[in-house]
């Protein structure tokens, strides 16, 4: 496998600006106007968010991730896609390396809303 190139160096301050949190995927729904996006309802402990993720073609059954905990970037600006609004980004592994992506998940259950870093 040829790995993706390492991205340009960033400062530690740049890294600390990312707010990556653990959430439980409570729902996985179709986005009617997209052949790639699925709408995830994610529980972050003190609130829920809608996050659009391009997983429709990556998984035989996208709903299989319902109930799993995963990492999400939560401090991106809201983004409208295919008539829906996304309030963050799913943090997955493999896409940049042309691999079938998988979720970044904790090795044991942790409270929703916990920060990665």
Where are these regions (language model features)?
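Phosphate-backbone binding interfaces of nucleic-acid-interacting proteins
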Residues: 1-117
């Amino acid at each position: 496998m040829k790995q993706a190139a390492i991205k340009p160096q960033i400062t530690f301050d740049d890294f600390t600006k990312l707010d990556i949190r653990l959430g439980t995927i409570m729902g996985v729904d179709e986005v009617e106007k997209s052949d790639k996006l699925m709408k995830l309802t994610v529980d972050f402990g003190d609130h829920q968010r809608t996050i659009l993720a391009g997983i429709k073609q990556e998984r035989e059954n996208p709903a299989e991730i319902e109930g799993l905990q995963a990492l999400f970037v939560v401090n991106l600006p809201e983004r409208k896609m295919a008539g829906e609004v996304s309030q963050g980004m799913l943090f997955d592994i493999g896409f940049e390396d042309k691999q079938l992506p998988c979720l970044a998940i904790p090795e044991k259950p942790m409270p929703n809303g916990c920060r990665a870093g």
